[in-house]
């Protein structure tokens, strides 16, 4: 597997907090993104993904990913497509708004990815979820003040 080595960066403004080895690459075909696009739109319409000046200092919030084959890949190399960084303000994502994470190394705080956009700031978290359960196919990271405020009444441990 090729791991790109073109662009080391850590953004300091509060979004990306990992080292990123990123290579610009063409977008995945639109036909490969129909299902992730439909789920992402549902999360956007229910305000679980979005961007508003009132929340998180105006940064976008929430993201979505889906595992890519091969599904028997070893830990830290379970590829996935993920929404690009700071795309929360967009009602619908086009292929150029998704990145592919090729590998992730938590001990080194490093993501290797490619695509037309840099991957979400939560890419390392998504990778760890896929490592915790090799059968996991999706990660949907949503933000809901309503659920958070009502967590105790729902029996959600805090």
Regions found by a protein language model. Give the residues of each.
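Glycine-rich flexible loops
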Residues: 2-158
